[in-house]
Amino acid sequence: MSLSTIFAAMALSATAVATDTVNLPTATVTAPAKTKVELLPLDVTMINSETIERSAETSLLPIMVSNVPGLFVTERGFMGYGVSGGSAGAVNIRGVGQGNKVLFLIDGQPQWAGVFGHSLPDTYVTNGVERVEVVKGPSSLLYGSNAMGGSVNIITRRQTRDGVFGSARAMFGSFSTQKFAVSTGVKKGKFSATVAGQVDRSNGNREGSEFWLANEFMQVQYDASDNWQTGVNVDMSQTHANNPGTTQSPLLSMWTRLQRGTASIYAKNRYDRFNGGVQAYINWGRNKVDDGYAPGATPRDYLFNSTDYNMGFTLYQTVNPWRDADISAGIDFVHWGGHNWNTDKIDPSKRSAEFKAHENEIAGYVMVQQGLWHDLLSINAGVRLQHSSQYGNEWVPQAGLVASPFKGSTMKFSFGKGFRAPNLRELYLYAPANPDLKPEYMYNYEVELRQRFLEGRLNVGIALFFIDGKDMIQTRMIDGRPKNMNTGKFINKGFEVDATYIINKEWSVSANYSYLHTDTPLLAAPKNKLNAKVDYAPGDFRFTLENSTIWSLYTNLDPVVKSDYTLLDLRAAYTLHNRVPVTLMVKADNILDRHYEIVYGCPMPGITLMGGVEFKF
C-alpha cells in the first residue's frame, strides 16, 4: 500500500481539518458585499486569516488548491505564473476555468485583463488579505460575465481594534529565494487604516525562470455614523517574470513586465431592516512582453506592449420586508477595453500592429429568499438581465433551497446559469477573430449535504454536481481559414467530500477529495484530487504535515500525456511570547522528492526549503 493511500485513509477515517477552513452554511460579512453568503444556495468555502498565515505562502493560489475540493491551479515552476505564451496560473473549478471562466474579485471588485480577458494570478497575494471566499458553481447572478464556473472574492484586512498593530516577516530558502512582508493598521474612533507591502524574488528551479514581485496595499475606512461607513482601497503590483520555455521547446530571453493597479471607493449602509451600498472602481494595467526565441534562431526585433482597464460601479440593497425574508437588488455597470501595439527594440518610437477597442455592459438583478418554519427550509430564487454593447441581452436565472431537517445538518439544492462574454482578442484581434460571437454559458445542478457532530468538532460534507456547457468558443476552419465560433459543448459531473475534526486542543485533522468526470479530456482538470492535513500544536509549537495527491491529470492532449503524483509537505513554527511576539518558522515542500509536471515540459522542483521569522506588534 502506498504512502499516499495510508495517509489518506488515516485522515479520512479520523476525519479531517480544522477550524481554519470552513464550508459556510451561514452568513459571512463581506465589505462591501452585495448579499449575505447565507442567501446563496451554492457551495461556499471560506479560507480565513489563520489558514493564510500558517501556510507561510505569499501567493493565495496554492492555499486555495489545498483547502478547496474541486479547485485546481496550474504551475510551471517554483515561483511565479506569468502571462502570455507558456504561462500558468489557470484556475479551474470542477473542470471549468480555462479562458477566464472563474472570476476573481478584490472586495467585490472584478479583476481581469481588459483585452485578453484572462485573470492575473501573480497579483493574488496574501499581502493585506483577511480571508478568501470561494463559490463553486455559477456566480453570474451577482457578478455577470466571467463568473461562469465560480468566483473567488479576496477580502482585504480591516483594523477593528483601537490602537496601532502590525507585523513583519522575512523568509529565505531554495533557489536564492527571498520573501519580505510588512503590514500595519491603526484605528482611532471612527477612523481606521491599513497599509501593507510585500516583495518576493527567486532564481527559480530552472535556468532562466527568475521571478520578482512587489505589492503595495492601502485601505482607509471611516464610520460616518452607526449606520453608514465609507472607505477607499488601493492595491498595486509589479512583476518581472522570465520563462525558459519547455524542455521540448526551450526559449531564450522570454520575459514579461507587468504593472497592475486597482482602486475603489465605497459607501455602505446597515439598518435593522435593510443594508446595502455603492462602489465605484477601476482596474488598470501596463504590460510589456518579449516572446523570446529558440536557441539558434534570430531574436525578435520588437516588444509587445499593452494597456488595459475595466472600470465601473455597482449599486446594491437588501431589504427585510417581513419575517425571515430578504430581497436583494442591484445595478452593475462596467466599461472595459485596452490598447495593444509592438515597439521596435532599437527605436521604441516605431510602432506597429496597433489595436484598440472597448465594450460597455450594464445589468440589473433581483434575488428573493424566504425562510419557512423557523428557517427549517429556505427558498431562494433570482434573475439577472445583462446588456452588452457587443452581444445584446443575456438572462441569468438561479434558484435553490436550503433545508435544516436535523440539528447540525444542512441540505442545499441549487440550479444556476453561468456565462462568459467573448473577450476583445476573440472578437477583434488576430486571424480567428469573429465580432459576431455570443457568450458561452452553462447550467449547473448541485446537491450538497453537510452534518456537524460532537458539538461542532466534527464537520462532514458531500456535494454532487452536474454541469452542461453550451456555445463554447472554439477555433474552426471555415473556407480554409481559422475562425472563432460558438460550437463547443461539454458535460462535467462528479462529487466532492470534505471533513474536519478537532480532536482536542492540540490535535486536528482534515481531508478533502474531489472526483471529476468529463466527456472530453481537459488540461488542468485532474480526475481525482486529494488533500489531507494533520495539525499538532503543543504549547508554543505548531507542526503541520500535509499530503496532496493527484491522479489522471492531463498535461498534454496531442500526444496524450497524463501526470500522477503525491506530495508531502511539512511546516513547523515556534512562537516566543515576549513583549513583541516572535515566530520562527520553517517549511519543507515535496519532502519525498517527487518528480512531476503540471504544465507539459515544465518540471516542478524537488525538495525545497524555506525558513524565516515573523514579528507582531
Which residues does each PLM region occupy?
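Flexible loop and strand-edge segments within Gram-negative outer membrane beta-barrel domains
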Residues: 202-209, 213, 227-310
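Outer-membrane beta-barrel signature, preferentially recognizing the C-terminal barrel domain
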Residues: 247-266, 270, 306, 357-359, ...
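C-terminal beta-signal and adjacent terminal beta-strands/loops
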Residues: 468-470, 552-554, 572-617
